[in-house]
């Protein structure tokens, strides 16, 4: 059974001196929105877990779907289309990919835009595939031209400490999916070169501190109160 949820987005505007704010409805009628990334002050890209990549004009309220051929699994539990980030005229999305034989992976695709649609969209990264149906992550962030992406440990726990697996890791890659030569473990032959951090469970939040130097992530831990 498919559930449609009407979600209302709000713009929150602050008056820091008077500590005043107001809520303004921007758009409604969305179906499980998961990630969004601003193009400019008036436009943004938004993903829905059901697989859509939408472009929303905050001024005209126009919602445009960007069709694609990515093998996004039917949304269930934590699976589906995940995060999106817009960078220099290109789109990067993370999603739960159907890898066949009931296996899935956290995958990242890069989309090129021409005439307000995708001229090409293709995978640049695929984590290992698994039958487990939990903990894909995933959030995306750019810093200094490099893409940071969080990958869940797929419910396998200790694999997050395994340097030969992408499960339970933060990766750092170039726009084409290759590993930067200065990644922390790139010189260690026993480690996957894309790995930036190990030991994560289900990281679903990431941000760059305002001073543009420190990265913060939110990692869902085993206990509900343990973040």
Q: What is each stretch, according to the model?
A:
Residues 11, 61, 119, 180, ...:
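Residue-level signal for pocket-adjacent positions within structured domains
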Residues 9-10, 40, 44, 191, ...:
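A generic structural signal for solvent-exposed, polar alpha-helical segments
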Residues 16-157, 208-227:
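Acidic, Gly/Ser/Thr-rich repeat motifs that build Ca2+-stabilized beta-propeller blades
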Residues 3-15:
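Sec-dependent N-terminal signal peptides
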Residues 79-81, 153-227:
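Beta-propeller domain segments
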């Amino acid at each position: 059974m498919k559930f449609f949820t009407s979600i209302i987005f709000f713009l929150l505007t602050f008056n820091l001196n008077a500590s005043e704010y107001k809520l303004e409805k921007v758009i409604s009628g969305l179906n499980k929105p998961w990630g969004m990334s601003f193009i400019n002050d008036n436009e943004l890209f938004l993903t829905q877990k059901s697989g859509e990549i939408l472009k929303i004009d905050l001024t005209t309220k126009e919602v445009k779907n960007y069709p694609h051929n990515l093998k996004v699994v039917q949304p269930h539990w934590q699976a589906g289309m995940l995060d999106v980030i817009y960078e220099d005229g290109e789109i990067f999305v993370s999603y739960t990919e159907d890898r066949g034989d009931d296996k899935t992976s956290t995958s990242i695709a890069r989309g090129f835009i021409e005439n307000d649609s995708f001229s090409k969209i293709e995978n640049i990264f695929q984590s290992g595939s698994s039958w487990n149906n939990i903990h894909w992550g995933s959030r995306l962030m750019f810093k200094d031209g490099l893409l940071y992406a969080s990958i869940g440990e797929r419910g396998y726990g200790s694999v997050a400490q395994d340097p030969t697996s992408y499960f339970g890791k933060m990766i750092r890659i170039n726009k084409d999916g290759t590993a930067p030569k200065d990644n922390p473990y790139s010189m260690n032959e026993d480690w996957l070169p894309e790995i930036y951090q190990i030991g994560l469970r289900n990281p679903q939040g990431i941000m760059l501190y305002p001073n543009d130097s420190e990265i913060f992530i939110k990692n869902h831990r085993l206990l509900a109160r343990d973040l």
